[in-house]
Amino acid sequence: MNSVKPGKVWLVGAGPGDPGLITVRGRDLLAAADVVLYDALSHPALLELCPPSAELRDVGKRGGSKNPSQDWITSQLIDLAQSGRNVVRLKGGDPSLFARGAEEALALYRAGVEFEIVPGVSSVVAASAYAGIPMTHRDLSSSVTFITGSDREGKSWSPDAWKRLATATETICVLMGMQRIDAITRALIDGGRSPETPAAVVQWAARPAQRVVTAPLWRIAEASHAAGLSNPALIMVGDVVSLREELRWYDRLPLFGRRLLVPRPEHQAMGTAEAIRRRGAEPIVIASIEIGPPPDPAALRSAALGVQNYDFCLFTSANGVDRFFEALAEVGRDARAFAGCRVGAIGPKTAQALVPHGIRADLVAREFVGEALAREILEIGGVRRVLIPRALVAREELPELLRAGGMTVDVVPAYETRPAGGPHKERLLTLLREGELDVLLFTSSSTVDSLVELLGPDAAGLLSRVTLACIGPITSATAQRHRLEVAVTADTYTVEGLLDALEKHYASSVS
């Protein structure tokens, strides 16, 4: 009789908001999971770390809607593991701190299911760090207390409990207490805490949407209500709050709080998204284009078979690199096929895409446009035959300049781009109509063309509501041909150069 080998459950702390705060262990477990059960506050970027085969189940609890019960979630973990699946239970913050991780672990133990607890950065620690409010300081606080705003049944702790806490510790951190902040602050003052004690409320900690309000203890409830703050939020009380003005680093990042649309496929936007987060902004990744096979795959395979007969093979995009090497593999060849053929790339990102395939570019254009690449090839001399695997529709300047220089140039479509539709379009329209975007980043002419086609005749009107930023003058010219108003054009034609230009744009607008 065959028996199923039991699986295992990992209770993984997802961290508080910034997906970069996931632990290395947590990241590796997500990448190998069969099933992921995730909370409402889990950042979507973390789910992108999961393999395509992974089953993703949303078990988050949200206010105002019907939520899965804790018993149901626990039974799912047990059933999945007993059926032989490896399960990641992705929990916001740290699974052992006010996250019911201990309850789930006990249930797994009693059911005989193997489990592991993987710590995460708690929301308390993140709120403290990202708001610039340390929980302890040698001169101000040597003790700190974490407490939830309600008891097991969801009821407020008794006023006497808050009064006892008032002077028992120097820093008080209250989680999930916004619904009772008025009663909590009154009880702390009644218990002997000075009404002038500095206090703060930190909402959406470690995310670009983070908001922080500070005020004396007697006024913090009123101030947070006036600012419209609600859960998820942390209430902090103590003299350490006075250090915020000097230590607030996160909301001083150059693009803090802005929402930037990246109209590229998710698997190609991860590096761009991370660069955006480093500057304090929130990347919104929505594919405006889909990458598909060329109309004549046989022509691409034929070019791959004969690549050694060319003096140079020029790549103008990472997509072209990936598709060409797929064709190379289909005909039973690998990087050794390039023996005798030099390789050129239009820019550093394209050159970087070659490295995993075992190729280092012999030439990377100093200026990241086709004309510059053509000039540098022409300067080399002795180049007779050139192969260019590229998109079906692309600018003709590169092959035309090379042909004008006496070279034989074969242009082979390696892939085709087309506008993405369905849910991508609907989500994009919703964000634009509701004013949920600040900036739209165009990183190529094809993303401009595809996005305009996706939005239809109202494209110019819809896009007039956001700041349009283009990676270079060619992309900018494409946008202008569609009657789009471009606010930012990068001088350095890379994502980092584009974000630098965007920073300068906003800095000049406030100076």
Q: What does each model-identified segment do?
A:
Residues 34-36, 56, 134, 172, ...:
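Short, well-ordered beta-strand core segments
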Residues 2-11, 82, 87, 106, ...:
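Beta-strand/loop-alpha-helix module characteristic of Rossmann-like adenine-cofactor folds
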Residues 27, 103-115, 131-138, 329-334, ...:
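A glycine- and small-aliphatic-rich helix-loop capping segment at beta-alpha/alpha-beta transitions
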Residues 44-45, 63-65, 122-126, 143-146, ...:
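Short gly/pro/ser/thr-enriched loop/turn and capping motifs at secondary-structure boundaries
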Residues 1-19, 24-121, 126, 226, ...:
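Class I S-adenosyl-L-methionine
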Residues 17, 69-73, 79-83, 207-511:
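Signature of uroporphyrinogen-III synthase
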Residues 5-16, 58-63, 145-150, 285-290, ...:
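Short, basic, glycine/proline-bearing loop/turn elements
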Residues 29-41, 198-203, 343-347, 467-472:
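Short internal beta-strands
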